[in-house]
């Protein structure tokens, strides 16, 4: 499917620039604000594009549901590129919630979606210092795992549920830095409270200046597992927000319901990790007191008394 679409695009003259070259900044006069904007743009990071053959090989290893997510992203990005031609209009964003338990390959899908989006959207004259796609997560560890940044640092989000808007200078810098933004990836969506979803909606509108478009016309891709614990001091992202500031928007067009749900179901882990992940996935959905004796026995093998030497090198300890 990807190969066929590439041939069609080449016929329309929409193939990407072979060098993916930066604009020649020497041609432009850069004032103080633009210089600071450029420095801040670098914070968002660049998405490295591997050899196309390698990308295609990795894509072929995806299961059916994983591939469906990547195909949606590629199709959307190709439509965005085609919309740059006279007479064509921008496509409506395919907002989605990619839901999957441990081991279903969410991180792999995020990586490939980012790479294919970058490869497809970058054409001759693209400014690679301005992100086309941003990878974010609620917590710093999760953000680092996907090569991204936290939501709060990316969009200068403040604590609390009320939306105060960006300062004049911050707004100007973000508008310049993110003027080419097409896709926003949010990992560990279960940690994002409902009010934060609506704050993000308003921030993106403020940045893109597309106030009538949900999420400012940016395609939002949420990844995670809603069976995990809800946000601390907040409602789950699919619930009604607490702050009355978002009540009308929630009543007319709930932002969560704009996300098309795509489920990743296949466990891709191997050996003991796969077996343990399967048990954890069953724990997520089983009724209280209904876990099998086999699953309980496996969980008991992971129990250690306080002070045990195994705890010294354990990355995560659960205490009860």
Segments (PLM) and residue ranges:
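Conserved ATP-binding/catalytic motifs of P-loop helicase motor domains
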Residues: 1-320
């Amino acid at each position: 499917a990807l190969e066929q679409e590439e041939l069609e695009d080449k016929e329309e003259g929409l193939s990407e620039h072979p060098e993916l070259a930066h604009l020649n900044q020497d041609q432009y006069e850069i004032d103080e604000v633009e210089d600071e904007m450029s420095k801040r743009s670098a914070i968002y990071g660049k998405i490295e594009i591997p050899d196309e053959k390698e990308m295609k090989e990795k894509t072929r290893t995806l299961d059916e549901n994983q591939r469906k997510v990547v195909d949606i992203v590629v199709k959307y990005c190709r439509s965005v590129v085609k919309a740059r031609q006279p007479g064509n209009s921008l496509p409506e964003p395919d907002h989605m919630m990619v839901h999957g338990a441990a081991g279903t390959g969410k991180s792999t899908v995020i990586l490939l979606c980012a790479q294919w989006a970058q490869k497809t959207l970058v054409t001759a004259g693209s400014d690679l210092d301005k992100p086309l796609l941003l990878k974010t997560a609620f917590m710093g560890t999760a953000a680092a795992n996907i090569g991204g940044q936290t939501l709060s640092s990316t969009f200068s989000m403040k604590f609390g549920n009320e939306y105060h808007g960006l300062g004049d200078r911050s707004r100007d810098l973000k508008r310049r830095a993110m003027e080419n933004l097409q896709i926003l990836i949010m990992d560990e969506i279960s940690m994002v409270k409902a009010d934060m979803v609506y704050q993000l909606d308003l921030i993106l509108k403020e940045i893109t200046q597309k106030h009538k478009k949900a999420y400012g016309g940016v395609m939002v891709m949420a990844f995670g597992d809603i069976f995990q614990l809800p946000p601390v001091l907040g409602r789950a992202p699919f619930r009604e927000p607490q702050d009355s500031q978002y009540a009308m928007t929630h009543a007319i067009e709930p932002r969560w319901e704009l996300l098309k749900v795509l489920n990743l179901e296949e466990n891709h882990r191997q050996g003991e990790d796969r077996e343990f992940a399967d048990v954890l996935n069953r724990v997520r959905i089983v009724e209280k007191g209904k876990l099998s004796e086999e699953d309980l026995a496996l969980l008991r093998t992971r129990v250690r008394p306080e002070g045990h030497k195994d705890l010294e090198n354990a990355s995560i300890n659960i205490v009860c």
